[in-house]
């Protein structure tokens, strides 16, 4: 064979033969091949072609060789070779572009030299044939070609290898979809034998612009519409084994829509059901095994089409970048992700996750879609989450789900809208862990709420346990998971405060331990009763057992009521809180070092108040226990109670009683005193009834004083007090009618007083707490028979130093205190005498300096707001400002007012301005409720009616009188008169448990002085005065029968 033709020379074709058309349908190419093969013997020799090409590149003539020669002359200077059979110009190929002895592909000598039909570049036939399987483009000029001329033995003797149509196309041509032989699919098999051409074989362009461009506002589809579609498509794309055949029927567009939905919903592949098989996807592996890259191409093409939509050029560019980087970087490397982020934007991580999942799986694309498991939809990238929760939890256990729902509903009812829920329904461990961790991040504003009710969490846990015990005994199916704790009580058992009060957190932990130990010591032998206050803890133990099988609604209601009533109970807490605030305690002393800020005082007060509430719960159970088993109470060594009482009087006790341990110590103290006094009273009358009365009164007194102590937190505390007291009257069920009536009347009177006297009382108490705090302790201890009746059990200690000034109203003079201590109590019954001495000794010893006017002024400056509740039933003032429960309790007040009046004992209270209304009612009830001492009514009446008609301005003016202490002498005289009146009360009054509470108020002084004529009118028209919203000084609180028994 002679010298081979130059590279640029085309093969000449037979004269009269039409030039071969551009690649079109398969039938046309077949006919062209047949014609070419049939006419090979008529072609001119390659030598003639070489000579023509040597002179100049010539256009193949469609007619004859002469035309070809003339055409060669025309393009002699152009050095271009036009494309045969087309109007497009071909790229120039220099004659010496490729050495004759080297193949551009294998860089070795030619083996079976072959020429491409378009550019006539020559290569080894085997090299270019394999090349065409990958890309049907010339390696040199990148022109696509359709056939290869090879085995050229003569000018007219050669063979033509026509490429199979399925291999036509290129990655860089968006109008063609390149397919590998190994990725045979239904669509490809159908298109190979279809005469429709490559247009029908390419991926159907989605109707939109792609998921990536939706976020840019090009086209947006609402996510909530896609979620149902997404779920349906998931079901379609994950058929069972029996339905695998149906997967083949899904059209390509449906698959693209499905994938688009996954990207919109943010649903990622969770796992692949691959049976433990997986592939290596490292860059080194792909470099060593380039054939493994082939399976990635179809998936990449589809996913990029989903993301970019009709932007085919972007699809090709990103696909090229990915395929190039796969062998450079690991798929999980940051470099790989960084190269794709400019293109995929916020979908980069999702795409990489899907890509890695597919690359690692052992399946092809179709099998991967079938075996992939997807997570629930995550929030959309651009739109954010439209649901309230980004976590979807599906519990397989229905019982656990129901219990969770109950707990969630319980928390949602709480007024505390903070993220720190009160886990009153959780177990003890949950309380410790959850609340402690939450408190570590709480700010100082939350500390007031947090530290105060640490033991209330203990009580909540105990209550939960007790409820479980009750539900076991009960035949109903209702299981109470927990109750909504008041806002102030939701704190953990172990309090760990942030930054500024870390020492306080550790201190409270220690105090909490002390509290628990003392509670356990008292609850030995009857742990089921004293461990916590059950829903029936306000009832006697006998009643509690009888009501063990009450319906679930009664159980739930009584539980809530008991929680609040017990939070108001426990006179022992009252005593401890008063002493804890008046005497230096570790916590109080720290607050003084911090500047004696109101917030600090109120915080400590709220803490002690909460703790006392918890122990009041405990004490309520204990009280019921004592009623059930009096022998146990009587058998308890009296010396032990006396010892405890004397120990609690210590200043060391008062220091320990601060914050959490304050309530525990007060528990022992009040319990010992109430037990001691109850034993004395039991000699002459029903001890248990009086015992309940003492607990009841002190519980209310504590509640009221607690409110006044936290005046700085008036908005918060007052609402809480109102809520707790208004609800507490439900659970105040007792065999003692006085117990019921008083609780009811106190609650209702407090609500009436709410509107007008709330602001007045707030302002008044701010001044009165400081000026009267010194005499408060004396008055409490040296009050009237009523004071002594309350105190006998030690319950009537003042809740805080804020209570000290109220007693000063009853006893502003030191002479009155000493007289009461020496002679006044000797005149009264002996059972009151011993208790009074204990109380007067305690207050006289610890507060001798408080009796002076100078000290009163100093207290006025240092004390926070105070309200003296000498009578045990006056928790109403603290709860008086509860607006939410106001209407509800007014209705109940009207409903039960008549019954309560007839059965209630005498309760005489000279109250602060805010208690005026409730005390008016009390006096009214005294007129209607059996034998009473007229002297008491005379003593109470002068201050009642005038106050009910007082205006806001008048009361505020009277505040000024109080602040100036202009009426101290007058107060002393009036109170001495009151004392005389109390001395004249016959033992019958004491046996009926008539209790006189003397409270100091400037308005009360003026009423005592100027309004003596109102006694008759008050007694004759008590019901008319009760509704007055301004009545805020005095009221006789009469309990009511709880209709829940």
From Swiss-Prot:
Modified residues (Phosphoserine): 98, 194, 499, 585, 718, 734, 864, 866, 912, 914, 1028
Residues in cross-link Glycyl lysine isopeptide (Lys-Gly) (interchain with G-Cter in SUMO2): 73, 76, 83, 88, 159, 249, 701, 819, 837
InterPro entries cross-referenced by the UniProt entry: Znf_C3HC4_RING-type, Znf_RING, Znf_RING/FYVE/PHD, Znf_RING_CS
Record carries keyword Ubl conjugation: yes
Region annotated Required for sumoylation and localization to discrete nuclear foci, chain positions: 437-574
This protein's UniProt keywords: DNA damage, Isopeptide bond, Metal-binding, Nucleus, Phosphoprotein, Retinitis pigmentosa, Transferase, Ubl conjugation, Ubl conjugation pathway, Zinc, Zinc-finger
Induction or repression: By genotoxic agents such as cisplatin and camptothecin.
PTM note: Phosphorylation at Ser-98 regulates the E3 ubiquitin-protein ligase activity but not the SUMO1-protein ligase activity. Phosphorylation at Ser-718 increases the E3 ubiquitin-protein ligase activity versus the SUMO1-protein ligase activity resulting in increased p53/TP53 ubiquitination and degradation. Sumoylated.
Region of interest (Interaction with SUMO1), ranges: 437-654
MF-aspect GO terms: antigen binding; DNA binding; DNA topoisomerase binding; SUMO transferase activity; ubiquitin protein ligase activity; ubiquitin-protein transferase activity; zinc ion binding
EC code: 2.3.2.27
Tissue expression remark: Expressed at highest levels in testis and at lower levels in adrenal gland, bone marrow, brain, colon, heart, kidney, liver, muscle, ovary, pancreas, placenta, prostate, skeletal muscle, skin, small intestine, spleen, stomach, testis, thymus, thyroid and uterus. Expressed in the alveolar epithelium of the lung. Expression is commonly decreased in colon adenocarcinomas and lung cancers.
Impact reported for residue 485 to R: No effect on sumoylation
Chief localisation class: nucleus
Spans annotated as Interaction with TOP1: 456-882
Function: Functions as an E3 ubiquitin-protein ligase and as an E3 SUMO1-protein ligase. Probable tumor suppressor involved in cell growth, cell proliferation and apoptosis that regulates p53/TP53 stability through ubiquitin-dependent degradation. May regulate chromatin modification through sumoylation of several chromatin modification-associated proteins. May be involved in DNA damage-induced cell death through IKBKE sumoylation.
Subunit comment: Interacts with PARK7/DJ-1. Interacts with TOP1. Interacts with p53/TP53; can both ubiquitinate and sumoylate p53/TP53. Interacts with the SUMO1 conjugating enzyme UBE2I. Interacts with SUMO1. Interacts with NKX3-1; polyubiquitinates NKX3-1 and induces its proteasomal degradation. Interacts with SIN3A; sumoylates SIN3A. Interacts with IKBKE; induced by DNA damage.
Name of the protein in its database record: E3 ubiquitin-protein ligase Topors
